[in-house]
Amino acid sequence: MAPTISKRIKTLSVSRPIIYGNTAKKMGSVKPPNAPAEHTHLWTIFVRGPQNEDISYFIKKVVFKLHDTYPNPVRSIEAPPFELTETGWGEFDINIKVYFVEEANEKVLNFYHRLRLHPYANPVPNSDNGNEQNTTDHNSKDAEVSSVYFDEIVFNEPNEEFFKILMSRPGNLLPSNKTDDCVYSKQLEQEEIDRIEIGIEKVDKEIDELKQKLENLVKQEAINGS
């Protein structure tokens, strides 16, 4: 029997932070049982609390839709931890559906994550001269690759019963500084802003250089045509 839904609380919004993404590591000669010979990586896809705290009080289950080449590609995880581990050789988009507890009476949250298996470089500010540097963020050839995103689920005008459930646990505020145990922080947020600003500056510089080349080309053509 479905629970009785209480009335919604107007003009109120409640947010709860999550992280989602995947980790991956290249396998050596020893592979898990039943892993196909062509598979090169062991990976885990997940939805978690930022500090690995319990999120099952408002999330009922998480469904991951893998590539169709996997046996039973639709995997439903109905208890924490909301994650699954597989092997593979290629990157692909994973559809993630988050189902909330029945009391929420909320629609399914539907989004995608691009499974990342290979290391990549991130431009980060150079503290000496402000120029960008390349870093692999520990994603070196033999290290574990991590592709993880921080987000907030916003519940607009939750019903009274679900509001009580949400308020039964404290909201998680971002700490000021990141640590080995707590990466997601205002410091990390600022670093991401800095990376975006570096990218914008680089693009603006390239645009200006191309404009100058175009102006010089037009002037040269005018001289040659006179």
UniProtKB/Swiss-Prot annotation:
Residues 187-224 form a coiled coil. One of its GO terms (cellular component) is cytoplasm. Residues 8-169 form the YEATS domain. The keyword Nucleus applies. It comes from the Eukaryota. CDD domains: YEATS_Yaf9_like. PROSITE patterns: YEATS. Component of the SWR1 chromatin-remodeling complex composed of at least ACT1, ARP4, RVB1, RVB2, ARP6, YAF9, VPS71, VPS72, SWC3, SWC4, SWC5, SWC7 and SWR1, and perhaps BDF1. Component of the NuA4 histone acetyltransferase complex composed of at least ACT1, ARP4, YAF9, VID21, SWC4, EAF3, EAF5, EAF6, EAF7, EPL1, ESA1, TRA1 and YNG2. Interacts with SWC4. Present with 259 molecules/cell in log phase SD medium. The coiled-coil domain is required for assembly into the NuA4 complex. This is Protein AF-9 homolog. It comes from Saccharomyces cerevisiae (strain ATCC 204508 / S288c) (Baker's yeast).
